[in-house]
């Protein structure tokens, strides 16, 4: 089995999907989890205005709507959390995503004060954060806020991780990667677009250039620039297609060096790192 085949198998990626079937699969997955653990009353998700959180948010709200109707349990809710760092450049996209999702509840937590306070505390301890590490601080502060909200609403935190993100480890460890449940896991980027198209999402929310937008020195840096490959390249690779040798090397290098991000903390029983 080639490394490409191993990666595809590990991430559960498929070369083709039926959008309606995958929508149903994600909704039923969320509903089943909530029904298995009836003490869970809320799904909590950060909404950025980008493709992934818009899709995950829509699926969460659809799952909650169906479950309330089927069970009569009105205590169930989907909580969308806006977490800007100061003023977000694409705030209108966030509002458009909220309008599309129609969440039961919307909370706004501006993380800038908390991030700056943490940075100052570290500075006083003799640690000066780089811009890149400050970006990770933002991602972790957002996750901290979501877990606090989930803790106060008997909820779980929903993630937006998918195959095209998992393969490159393009997420912050214990930041946006530290979630309870990931309904998009298995899909690549273009397949996510297919689901949003089927759901009637406004095109500008999934046709814009994806960005983590974590770095102050490089605001709105496109993911594809940071990664050195395009999402079309990544999706082709995940679909088992032949890609240029340099593209394959870049993708596989990202996959191998970020393996620790896709695993629990390493223990004496692990040996995947002995390479």
From Swiss-Prot:
It catalyses: deamido-NAD(+) + NH4(+) + ATP = AMP + diphosphate + NAD(+) + H(+). This is NH(3)-dependent NAD(+) synthetase. GO terms for molecular function: ATP binding; glutaminase activity; metal ion binding; NAD+ synthase (glutamine-hydrolyzing) activity; NAD+ synthase activity. CDD domains: NAD_synthase. It comes from Escherichia coli O8 (strain IAI1). Pathway: Cofactor biosynthesis; NAD(+) biosynthesis; NAD(+) from deamido-NAD(+) (ammonia route): step 1/1. Belongs to the NAD synthetase family. GO terms for biological process: NAD biosynthetic process. Homodimer. One of its GO terms (cellular component) is cytoplasm.
